[in-house]
Amino acid sequence: KAREMIQELYRYYNRHANRMPKEYLELIDQKAQPQERVVCDYIAGMTDQYAIDRFAEIFIPKAWRG
């Protein structure tokens, strides 16, 4: 399940890079690194709980959350 969650976050942030923090967007804008690498770095820097929270915020309808 964790792998699938990370894969979904990766796909999401590759399609919606503008949802990442400003410092990551600047790396993409400056062409310092390819977007795919920046997305990987962003996700790799997440704590487990932060990744779970982002996943829930993005993919789980609010009415389903407790």
Where are these regions (language model features)?
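Histidine-centered, transition-metal-coordinating active-site segments
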Residues: 1-66
